[in-house]
Amino acid sequence: MPELPEVEVTRLSFAGRIAGARIEAVSMGKPLRWPLGCSPQQLVGLRVLAVRRRGKYLLVDLSDGLLLIHLGMSGSVSFGSSLSSPGKHDHFDMVTSLGTLRLNDPRRFGAVVYAGDEHDAVAHKLLGRLGVEPLSDAFDAALFHQALKPRQTPIKQVLLGGEAVVGVGNIYASEALFLAGIRPTTKASRISKPRAALLHRAIRQVLTQAVTKGGSTLRDFSNAQGEAGHFQLDAMVYDRAGMPCKVCGSPIKSIRQGQRSTFYCVSCQKP
C-alpha cells in the first residue's frame, strides 16, 4: 500500500505541472472503493488551484470544491500530455488544458471523491479522524508522548492506526521503531517520555529520507512521471527476515501484527 512518502512523492511529481489547468473532460472506468459523489460533467470548466496532501490522501483544490484521491492498496497517479488510451486498470481520467490526470488501480481499493470543501460531511468522514502530520511543526514530541500514554496496544499497531500520528504505514513504522530502538510489540502506554522523543525524531527522519529517495517501490509503485522509488534499498529491517542486522549482525525477525508483517532486531530493539 502506498504510504505517506509515496503519496507525497506523487504530489510533488505533478502538483506544479497541473496548477492553473482547466478541466476539459472527466471519464470513469469501473467503480472504485467509493463513488465520485458528483456527475463527471460537473467538474468540467473548473480550474485546478493546487494539490495538497493530508495523510495518505491527495487533495486537489478546485475553483469550486476539491477532489480527494486515495491510492488504496495498489493505485498510482500519472499526469502528462501524451498518455496512452485508458487501459484495463485505468479507472479515472481527468483531461485538463495542461495534461491528463489518471488513476490506475488494479485492485480498485482506491478512490476519487468530490467534496464541496475540506470541512463538509464527505471530507470530514474521510479526514476527520486523521492524526497530526508527522512532517509538520504540529508534530510535537511531548504531545506525541501524551497521545501514546492511554493506549494499551503494541506501539507498531498504534502507529498504523493513524490517530496518534498519520500516514506512517507498515514499512516506515518498522524502520522508525528500529531507529528508535523500540521493539514493535511494546505497549504504547509503557513508552517513556525520552523514548517517545526518540521515536518522534525517528519517524520524522525516516519519512524525510523516504521522500528524498522517491518512496519505496516493492512491486509497482511509481510517481506521476513513472519514476520508481529507492528507499527500500536502504531499509534496515523491513523485508529482511533472517538476514543479519546491519548494526549488530543478529538475524532480523519477522512476526505478524494485525495481519501485517513486522520486522525487527531482537538485540537492537528493547521492550
Swiss-Prot record:
The organism's place on the tree of life at top rank:
Bacteria
Q: Which reaction does it catalyse?
A: Hydrolysis of DNA containing ring-opened 7-methylguanine residues, releasing 2,6-diamino-4-hydroxy-5-(N-methyl)formamidopyrimidine; 2'-deoxyribonucleotide-(2'-deoxyribose 5'-phosphate)-2'-deoxyribonucleotide-DNA = a 3'-end 2'-deoxyribonucleotide-(2,3-dehydro-2,3-deoxyribose 5'-phosphate)-DNA + a 5'-end 5'-phospho-2'-deoxyribonucleoside-DNA + H(+)
Positions annotated as zinc finger (FPG-type): 236-270
Catalytic residues, chain numbering = 2-3, 56, 260
| E.C. designation(s) | 3.2.2.23, 4.2.99.18
Instruction: Give the matching Gene3D superfamilies.
Output: 1.10.8.50, MutM-like, N-terminal
* Swiss-Prot/TrEMBL GO biological process terms: base-excision repair
Q: Residues that bind DNA, according to the entry?
A: 89, 107, 151
User: GO: which molecular function terms?
Assistant: 8-oxo-7,8-dihydroguanine DNA N-glycosylase activity; class I DNA-(apurinic or apyrimidinic site) endonuclease activity; damaged DNA binding; zinc ion binding
**Keywords carried by this UniProt record:** DNA damage, DNA repair, DNA-binding, Glycosidase, Hydrolase, Lyase, Metal-binding, Multifunctional enzyme, Zinc, Zinc-finger
How many cofactor units bind, and how? Binds 1 zinc ion per subunit.
This protein's cofactor list reads:
Zn(2+)
On assembly, the entry states: Monomer.
Q: What does this protein do?
A: Involved in base excision repair of DNA damaged by oxidation or by mutagenic agents. Acts as a DNA glycosylase that recognizes and removes damaged bases. Has a preference for oxidized purines, such as 7,8-dihydro-8-oxoguanine (8-oxoG). Has AP (apurinic/apyrimidinic) lyase activity and introduces nicks in the DNA strand. Cleaves the DNA backbone by beta-delta elimination to generate a single-strand break at the site of the removed base with both 3'- and 5'-phosphates.
Family indicated by similarity: Belongs to the FPG family.
Protein name, please? Formamidopyrimidine-DNA glycosylase
- Which organism does this record belong to? Polaromonas sp. (strain JS666 / ATCC BAA-500)
